[in-house]
């Protein structure tokens, strides 16, 4: 059963209409299912079409077979019995010692006692006089719902002596409503008082106590005797203070016990299921707190988990007659589970994502709120403070929180700060989420922020977050922060939008010392990473650019300088060793992190900001500007018994210094058997650090037949291993094994070979690598009819490959990868499935890349590569590079813009014929494969 006592009659009627419509739909569905056996003879098909499979699966997963509509319908049918005031017999001093006297001089019902107070048992400890103060009107609602629900949830039935057995229930409920409508709370209480006195004289003492208590409350509320409708006080922010000074010792000891007994007697968790999806940003937040305290802690019983919190503006207390100033009710959840913490889904301003409103917020319009749903444990006069940075870092790594940590109430005009939770669940369940969740600040003044907050009150939580959260400009590093400061009236380019999303995503979490309680332009978003990405992407705060930032070579170079810090190895046989200088011919790479690489979009041109400075590969002809010098000492021998080629690498001397300042390098030797220049044929020695004369004394072994070996070439190259994997080429030696004299003993001895510069293997270009049949299409306006200019899409349809080479004998398991250059990020790369056991695989796979403007088509290039997947490695077979082949991209010379005439013709046809598939069959070739970045 659900406590629906807070619903108005209009709200109940609206819910009943929904329930009636649901019942009508169920009847229609049952009628359809009843006639199904006449039409369908197959039992399995009948099971699927009738929905029987769903209920069987549900029965296995959920024990509760009661539908939500049935629960609400049963709750709506319950009537309100007359008042029972036995909860006030032990509270003679409640009005004096209660915190209500210090707040707003009104009778108040704590949330944990609302609808739960029952007749105490004989063995129960006496309740504390100050533990609860009862609002007469709200007690009628809560007690009525609890008394009617007790036979369903309590282990034993309890009779309320104050419920009249002579008066019919319907008449009692109607009389209560009439009295309430005429005389407000006073009339309602008087009616219940008369019922008590006429019902039982034995309880006259309790009734007199209630009357005396009411008289005291009337003195504090001058407008109550006039029969006017008194508006409930607006709840203030909860203060979690663990030390009490104005409660006596006996009351303190009995208070947790009373709460425990009254709540455990219910037998089942209770939830107030009111949610407002269109609430403002100062709505109540769901605070989950679970901490074991001693009985003298005076806060929470050990057997309870109380989820509650309030965030509101203080100025709403001054003007509570305005509907706009009223804050939504605080929602309190009770759970009888002690050890298990409830799973916390992603929250947006305290709301569960996807949670819809059960009730409409009519109370905001009418200016009414129920004050019986709030309670504040406030005994310590010391003001609470936020945690210091040291405490914050300690709490993120420790599952417990210091008891001295409290919540700061919101000041006037303050902006709610989510995530400042002094509870253990968030810190234990999602420590990484708290540490990694960015702090996103508003770059606006307070007045404009408050004005904008008023305009987004009726929005949903998702929309509300997207309007209330904006990236902080100071968090965006590098040139993107400077570029954002330039304004324009043009549409922001997709590149800048991606820069903004990437910058917002890379912002580290700020310490709590940067968040002030009276600041109105800051908000800390504590939600799941995927939700944070979505909310950050919804923000459009990037000023428009008068020109394309990639049209300037200097700007493009500056952006690519910081990219190498994010490069990493990949197990797809894209060469891990690259030259110290890229095809952009940069003088030196920075080793600082960049916010321009970690992009989540799979579009090619949207994430152009991740322009990689590394387009080197094993087939590239540009290997940096380091001077190649020195010698290497090694020997080779073929062992017939093992059928292995042994390459004994002894040492090197007089190598070039990669670190010019310190005159040292970290060299290692890498060996290939050409033409198989992939990871399957690559062998490497260990890295000898900080020397120009490394000594290895290692043997590199190749398991290969001698007849096949005579068709190979041995390539030994020396590389400097950089900390950030930007490896520099130091020289190489190449031996033609076809002409090698294996019988000459001199060739088996260690010999010195001078190192030479790298030369591109032109002979490999002429080899037949197979063909690819594909089709391209450019869609300039994917969503027609929009007023604002939109970016286009490039569709790549990979149909099949023909006559692929066999590099592993008769085994082949091929697949195709696609990358839109200059974007080499992993997240923008797409690939087909692997098709094995054939040299003519049929893929029939379409890849879509968005974010293309007409001018981007002139600078971009589609790189399609075919790979042979074998165990944990992938071997390159061939590829295409479809573009205009100008050799430049956004004004910068690049070596990947090297399309052949056939590839250029296909790209030109696609650009000149939008919304049309252009088919072609192109020969695969060896490529200068661009290195993949993160």
Curated annotation (Swiss-Prot):
Q: Which Pfam families match?
A: C2, FYVE_2
Q: Which GO terms describe its molecular function?
A: neurexin family protein binding; phosphatase binding; phosphatidylinositol-4,5-bisphosphate binding; phosphatidylserine binding; small GTPase binding
Tissue specificity, per the record, is: Isoform 1 is expressed in hematopoietic lineages with a strong expression in CD4 and CD8 T-lymphocytes. It is also widely expressed in nonhematopoietic tissues. Isoform 5 is expressed only in nonhematopoietic tissues. Isoform 4 is expressed in pancreatic alpha cells.
Q: Which UniProt keywords apply?
A: Cell membrane, Cytoplasm, Exocytosis, Membrane, Repeat
What the entry lists under SMART domains is as follows: C2
Listed Basic and acidic residues bias regions? 192-205, 246-264, 285-297, 359-368, 442-452, 461-470
A GO BP entry is:
exocytosis
Naturally occurring in which organism (per UniProt):
Homo sapiens
Q: What is known of its domains?
A: The RabBD domain mediates interaction with RAB27A and recruitment on to vesicular structures in cytotoxic T-lymphocytes (CTL).
Mark out the compositionally biased spans (Low complexity).
125-139, 593-604
| Assembly | Monomer. Binds NRXN1. Interacts with RAB27B. Binds RAB27A that has been activated by GTP-binding.
So which domain of life are we looking at?
Eukaryota
Enumerate the SUPFAM superfamilies for this protein. Answer: C2 domain (Calcium/lipid-binding domain, CaLB) (SSF49562)
The residues covered by the C2 domain are 628-753, 768-897
Q: What gene is behind this protein?
A: SYTL2
Q: Which GO terms describe its cellular component?
A: cytoplasm; cytosol; exocytic vesicle; melanosome; membrane; plasma membrane
Q: Which CDD domains match?
A: C2B_SLP_1-2-3-4 (cd04020)
Q: Where is the composition biased (Polar residues)?
A: 161-191, 219-229, 392-415, 430-440
Maturation and modification = Isoform 1 is highly susceptible to proteolytic degradation and is stabilized by the interaction with RAB27A.
Q: Which InterPro entries match?
A: C2_dom (IPR000008), C2_domain_sf (IPR035892), FYVE_2 (IPR041282), Rab_BD (IPR010911), SYTL1-5_C2B (IPR043567)
**What is the designated name of this protein?**
Synaptotagmin-like protein 2
């Amino acid at each position: 059963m659900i406590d629906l006592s807070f619903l108005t009659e209009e709200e109940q009627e609206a819910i009943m209409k929904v329930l009636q419509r649901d019942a009508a739909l169920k009847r229609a569905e049952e009628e359809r299912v009843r006639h199904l056996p006449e039409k369908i003879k197959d039992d399995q098909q009948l099971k699927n079409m009738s929905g029987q499979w769903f209920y069987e699966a549900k029965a296995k997963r959920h024990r509760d077979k009661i539908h939500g509509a049935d629960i609400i319908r049963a709750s709506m049918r319950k009537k309100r019995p007359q008042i029972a005031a036995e909860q006030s017999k032990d509270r003679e001093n409640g009005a004096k010692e209660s915190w209500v006297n210090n707040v707003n001089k009104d009778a108040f019902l704590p949330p944990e006692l609302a609808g739960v107070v029952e007749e105490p048992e004989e063995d129960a400890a006496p309740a504390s006089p100050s533990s609860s103060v009862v609002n007469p009107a709200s007690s009628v609602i809560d007690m009525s719902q609890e008394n009617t629900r007790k036979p369903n949830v309590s282990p034993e039935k309890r009779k309320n002596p104050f419920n009249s057995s002579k008066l019919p229930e319907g008449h009692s409920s109607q009389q209560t409503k009439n009295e309430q409508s005429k005389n407000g709370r006073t009339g309602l209480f008087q009616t219940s008082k008369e019922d008590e006195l006429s019902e039982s004289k034995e309880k006259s003492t309790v009734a007199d106590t209630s009357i005396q208590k009411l008289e005291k409350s009337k003195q504090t509320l001058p407008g109550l005797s006039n029969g006017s409708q008194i508006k409930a006080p607006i709840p203030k922010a909860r203060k979690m203070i663990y030390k009490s000074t104005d409660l006596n010792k006996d009351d303190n000891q009995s208070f947790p016990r009373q709460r425990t007994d009254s709540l455990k007697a219910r037998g089942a968790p209770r939830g107030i299921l009111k949610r407002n999806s269109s609430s403002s940003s100062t709505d109540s937040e769901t605070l989950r707190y679970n901490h074991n305290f001693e009985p003298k802690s005076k806060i929470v019983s050990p057997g309870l988990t109380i989820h509650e919190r309030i965030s509101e503006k203080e100025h709403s207390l001054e003007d509570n007659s305005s509907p706009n100033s009223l804050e939504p009710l605080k929602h309190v959840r009770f759970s009888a589970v002690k050890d298990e913490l409830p799973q916390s889904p992603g929250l947006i301003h305290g709301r569960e994502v996807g949670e819809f409103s059960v009730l409409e917020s009519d109370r905001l319009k009418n200016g009414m709120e129920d004050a019986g749903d709030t309670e504040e444990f406030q005994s310590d006069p010391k003001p609470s403070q936020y945690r210091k940075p040291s405490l914050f870092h300690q709490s993120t790594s420790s599952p417990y929180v210091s008891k001295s940590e409290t919540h700061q109430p919101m000041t006037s005009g303050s902006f709610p700060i989510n995530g400042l939770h002094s509870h253990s669940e968030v810190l234990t369940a999602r420590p990484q989420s708290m540490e990694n969740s960015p702090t996103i600040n508003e770059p606006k003044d307070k007045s404009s922020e408050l004005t904008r907050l008023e305009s987004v009150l009726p929005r949903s939580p998702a929309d509300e977050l997207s309007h209330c959260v904006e990236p902080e400009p100071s968090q965006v590093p590098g040139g993107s922060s400077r570029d954002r400061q330039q304004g324009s009236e043009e549409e922001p380019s997709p590149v800048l939008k991606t820069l903004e999303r990437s910058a917002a995503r890379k912002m580290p979490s700020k310490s709590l010392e940067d968040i002030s309680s009276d600041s109105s332009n800051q908000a800390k978003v504590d939600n799941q990473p995927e939700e944070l990405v979505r909310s950050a992407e919804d923000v459009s705060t990037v000023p428009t650019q008068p020109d394309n930032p990639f049209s300037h070579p200097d700007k493009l170079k500056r952006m690519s300088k910081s990219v190498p810090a994010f490069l990493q190895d990949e197990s797809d046989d894209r060469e891990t060793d690259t030259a110290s200088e890229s095809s952009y011919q940069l003088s030196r790479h920075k080793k600082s992190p960049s916010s321009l690489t970690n992009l989540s979009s799979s579009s090619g041109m949207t994430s152009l900001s991740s322009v990689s400075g590394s387009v080197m590969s094993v087939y590239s002809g540009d290997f940096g500007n380091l001077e190649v010098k020195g010698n290497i000492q090694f020997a080779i021998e073929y062992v017939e018994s093992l059928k292995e080629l042994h390459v004994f690498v002894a040492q090197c001397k007089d190598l070039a210094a990669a670190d010019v300042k310190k005159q040292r390098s970290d060299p290692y030797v890498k060996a290939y058997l050409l033409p198989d220049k992939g990871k399957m044929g690559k062998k490497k020695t260990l890295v000898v650090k900080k020397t120009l004369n490394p000594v290895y004394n290692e043997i590199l072994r190749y398991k290969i037949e001698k007849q096949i070996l005579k068709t190979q070439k041995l390539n030994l190259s020396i590389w400097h291993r950089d900390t950030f994997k930007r490896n520099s080429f130091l020289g190489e030696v190449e031996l033609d094994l076809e002409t090698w004299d294996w019988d000459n003993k001199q060739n088996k001895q260690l010999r010195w070979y001078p190192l030479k510069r790298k030369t591109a293997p032109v002979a490999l270009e002429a080899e037949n690598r197979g063909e690819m049949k594909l089709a391209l299409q450019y869609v300039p306006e994917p969503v027609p009819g929009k007023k604002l200019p939109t970016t286009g899409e490039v569709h790549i349809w990979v149909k099949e490959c023909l006559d692929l080479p066999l590099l592993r004998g008769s085994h082949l398991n091929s697949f195709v990868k696609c990358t839109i250059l200059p974007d080499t990020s992993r997240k923008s790369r797409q690939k087909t499935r692997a098709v094995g056991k054939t040299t003519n695989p049929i893929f029939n796979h379409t890849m879509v890349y968005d974010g293309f403007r007409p001018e981007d088509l002139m600078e971009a290039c589609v790189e399609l590569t075919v790979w042979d997947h074998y165990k944990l490695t992938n071997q390159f077979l061939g590829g295409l590079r479809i573009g205009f082949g100008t050799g430049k991209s956004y004004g910068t010379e690049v070596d990947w813009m090297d399309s052949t005439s056939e590839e250029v013709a296909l790209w030109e046809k696609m650009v000149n014929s939008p919304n049309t598939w252009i088919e072609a069959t192109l020969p695969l070739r060896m490529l200068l494969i661009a290195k993949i970045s993160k």
